[in-house]
C-alpha cells in the first residue's frame, strides 16, 4: 500500500487529483515531477475552459495490462446463501480437519453487531478460513476479504499465451474465490480508490471487511510491519477496527505438516478500537500492529 500513501501525500501537498494508472507507471522522481506538472496544467485548463480535464481510459489499461473487476453480485442474497452453504458444508469442516483451532477473546465481541474492519497477521492462504471460524455467526456471515488485486485479476483474465485448460482453471479459481470467499481486489499499484469505494459499499450493506496489513505472508513467523495504507482505509471507512491474530499455523506450515493437533492453532480476538477522523494513517498502522502483537 506504499503507493497509496505516497499518492495521497502528493495530492494533499500539491492540491491535485492524480491519475492512478499514470502514477503507477512513474518509475523515477523525474516521472513524478512531470506527472505533477502535467496534472497541474490540466487542472488549470479545466478551470479556464469550464469542463473537467479528460483522462485516458483505454490507454491506461494498456499501460497496466489490468482492469480490476468488482462484482456486486457477490454481495447479493443468492450468492450469500451459496457462500454460507459452502462454508458450513466444506470450509468449516476443512478448517477443523486441518487443525481444530482454539479461539480466545470472543467475549470482546459481546454486543458488537458490526460492520467492522478486521485486521490480522498473514500466515498462509488458509488464514481466511480460520478467521471466519473464529468470528461469531453474525460477523462471519457477512465478511468481505481484500486480497492482492493483481494476482486476483490475472485469474479472471489469464494471459492469452497461457494453455487453454490453465486459463479455464484460473477462471474457475477466480469464480470460486469471489463467490465462496467474497474476495475483492486491493491493488498494489493502481485502482486502489475503486477498491476503497467497493469496501465502503460493502460496509454500507452491512459487511465487515478483512484485510491483512502486512501485505504478504510472514517468512519467519514474526509480524511484518503494517503498511500505513490500512490507516487510509480506516479513515475512509470510519468503523470500529477488530485486531485478530493467528498463532501456531506458521509452525505447522514451516514443518511441512498437513494437519495440526487440536488446539495447536490459536486464533486470538482483541477488543474493537476506533480512531478519531483524520488520524495520521501511519499512527493508525502502528497502533494496530501493536494491538495485534499484544494479543
Task: Annotate each predicted stretch with a short phrase.
Residues 1-64:
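Phosphopantetheine-dependent thiolation modules in NRPS/PKS and related acyl-activating systems
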Residues 5, 126-130, 229-232:
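Short amphipathic alpha-helical face segments that pack within enzyme cores
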Residues 10, 118, 211:
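Conserved S/T- and glycine-rich ATP-binding loop of Class I adenylate-forming
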Residues 50-82, 149-169:
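Compositionally biased, charge-rich terminal segments
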Residues 74-98, 157-182, 193, 197, ...:
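Alpha-helical membrane-targeting segments
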Residues 91-122:
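Helix-to-loop junction immediately C-terminal to a conserved catalytic motif
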Residues 113-190:
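Catalytic core of membrane glycerolipid acyltransferases/transacylases, capturing the structured
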Residues 190-295:
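Non-catalytic C-terminal accessory region of glycerolipid acyltransferases
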Amino acid at each position: 500500500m506504499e503507493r497509496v500513501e505516497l499518492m495521497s501525500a502528493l495530492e494533499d501537498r500539491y492540491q491535485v487529483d492524480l491519475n492512478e494508472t499514470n502514477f503507477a507507471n512513474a518509475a523515477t522522481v523525474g516521472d513524478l515531477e512531470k506527472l505533477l506538472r502535467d496534472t497541474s496544467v490540466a487542472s488549470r485548463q479545466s478551470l479556464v475552459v469550464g469542463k473537467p480535464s479528460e483522462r485516458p481510459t483505454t490507454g491506461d489499461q494498456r499501460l497496466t495490462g489490468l482492469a480490476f473487476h468488482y462484482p456486486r453480485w457477490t454481495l447479493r442474497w443468492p450468492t450469500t446463501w451459496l457462500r454460507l452453504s459452502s462454508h458450513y458444508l466444506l470450509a468449516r469442516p476443512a478448517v477443523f480437519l486441518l487443525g481444530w483451532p482454539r479461539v480466545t477473546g470472543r467475549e470482546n465481541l459481546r454486543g458488537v453487531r458490526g460492520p467492522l474492519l478486521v485486521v490480522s497477521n498473514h500466515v498462509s492462504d488458509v488464514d481466511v478460513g480460520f478467521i471466519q471460524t473464529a468470528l461469531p455467526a453474525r460477523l462471519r456471515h457477512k465478511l468481505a476479504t481484500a486480497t492482492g488485486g493483481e494476482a486476483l485479476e490475472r485469474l479472471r483474465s489469464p494471459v492469452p499465451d497461457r494453455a487453454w485448460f490453465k486459463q479455464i482453471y484460473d477462471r474457475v479459481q477466480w469464480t470460486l474465490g469471489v463467490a465462496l470467499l467474497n474476495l475483492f481486489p486491493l491493488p498494489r499499484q493502481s485502482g486502489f480508490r475503486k477498491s476503497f469505494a467497493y469496501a465502503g459499499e460493502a460496509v454500507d450493506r452491512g459487511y465487515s471487511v478483512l484485510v491483512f496489513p502486512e501485505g504478504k505472508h510472514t517468512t519467519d513467523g514474526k509480524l511484518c510491519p503494517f503498511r500505513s495504507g490500512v490507516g487510509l482505509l480506516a479513515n475512509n471507512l470510519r468503523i470500529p477496527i477488530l485486531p485478530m491474530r493467528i498463532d501456531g499455523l506458521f509452525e505447522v506450515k514451516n514443518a511441512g505438516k498437513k494437519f495440526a493437533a487440536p488446539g495447536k492453532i490459536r486464533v486470538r480476538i482483541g477488543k474493537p478500537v476506533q480512531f478519531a477522523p483524520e488520524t495520521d494513517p501511519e499512527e493508525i498502522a502502528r497502533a494496530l500492529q501493536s494491538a495485534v502483537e499484544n494479543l
